[in-house]
């Protein structure tokens, strides 16, 4: 791993992608914590996927968290993970970052970067000073079933999204400008009117530049300029 990432809490990772013969429009589904009150959404996804390889077989939709057979769901997930690995449907992008462009159904494009998060640098406790903090409340009763899915899982399918405070646009925007010259790793429509997704593998030089940009955002000077408010407290006037 590029040593420049060692103190950032976000790193390049070994990223598994389906091989070219997999139908990506059936492979990709939304995160497990979406549409929790709409089981009919997940029923439609089930019909769309059918017997095709899909991440639907590798996640526990949280619409099913209270199902009486949730332990069977979890066992099936772990079995599907092992099956996909044994069948060799994945290729591995070693020590990589992927720049993505997500075209929404309303025409807006969201830009991002896929890598690995160091959970030792994360804390969801309100008021935490950790490098990576929660932006919303954590639903604690959803943690145990998520932990059970991961306990015997041979692969990991995280869906965490991090926000960066980058007013000078040093991290993502240089990749956007270079996207047409980068190696494309996927480009397809998402199911259920989910829009379109494109992914591009970063070069070694681009990974190095991302590390430098992120490091610049975490310097003491940068943190103070953005977040430190100096409060002057006067001594009380004595009579």
Regions found by a protein language model. Name each.
Residues 231-239:
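Residue-level detector of conserved catalytic or cofactor/ligand-binding positions
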Residues 1-190:
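N-terminal extension/subdomain marker
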Residues 157, 222-224, 238:
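Structured catalytic/nucleic-acid-binding cores of DNA maintenance enzymes
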Residues 191-228:
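Helix-hairpin-helix/helix-loop-helix acidic hairpins
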